[in-house]
Amino acid sequence: MKKIIAAAILLGLLLFLIPMGLRQSRQTELPEDAREELVLPSSGYTLSVLVNGTVQELDLNDYLWGVVAAEMPASFAQEALNAQAVAARTYALNKAGRAAGHPEAELCTDYACCQAWIARETARGNWGENALAYTNKITAAVAETNNEVILYEGQLIDAVFHSSSGAATQDAVEVWGNSVPYLQSVDSPEGEEVPNYYSEAVFPAQAFRDTFLAARPEAVLEGEPPQWIGDTVYTEGGSVHTIVIGGVTVTGAQAREIFGLRSACFTVTPTAEAVTFSVTGYGHGVGMSQYGANAMAQQGKTYEEILRHYYTGVTVENYEPTDRQ
């Protein structure tokens, strides 16, 4: 009887310890990217980049890593980050050497001229406890799309992008006055979940008058604000195409710049005391919406599908940087 009891106790211990061992084993079998930093492969192609006043020679992939990290939140879905990497690569190769503001370098890190860029060490410091995970997501975005670009009829496109749109992106001709076949207005799925999707800018009457007259001194702003605002024409994408202020017609893009609005997708409410702009989205609205890309990725779309949605009639193909004209 004692032997039977001892055997039963031993069997019970084994049944208890074996699952524990299995659980411990599973806990240590973490994905490699959760424990180690991925290695970013070299593109084999070098660009001269103006960084804080100094020209640096950067491998294309190292440059793109800093662009994706600076231009798109690393918390976004992987397919959205991949789409950003392809758009950034295309934009860089198309733009390199053509920016008049810095003849000593092919590109710069000023987002208003080329693309935003951040050093890896700075980005990791900003990400805190998420540094390893986010570093690997950006590395994967660049590596998984290595050499891939966006082409229209065999040529690199001007792969412009922006933060968020209203219900749709804008046709390039409505914003910049030149028609571009692949920069058409398309639906964009982001919405109120986007930070600061809706914003408001309120100008007291005198401040509105001073601001607009500084930009358009020929305007006539007499009486009260309701008399200043004339007809507003909207684009297919829902942004302001033109608006009449003080008898002067300006484009939505010009009004956005004059009044410092987040986008040209706005409505205007004038009262006797003030003029209020109610704004939707952020950015010029042309090309790929970054928050729209993230929404599409969360819906299960691939980065190729995202890019083909936002850039009409394009293809995503492998491309050697030395092939650019």
Predicted feature locations:
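Conserved, single-site charged/polar hotspot
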Residues: M1-Q325
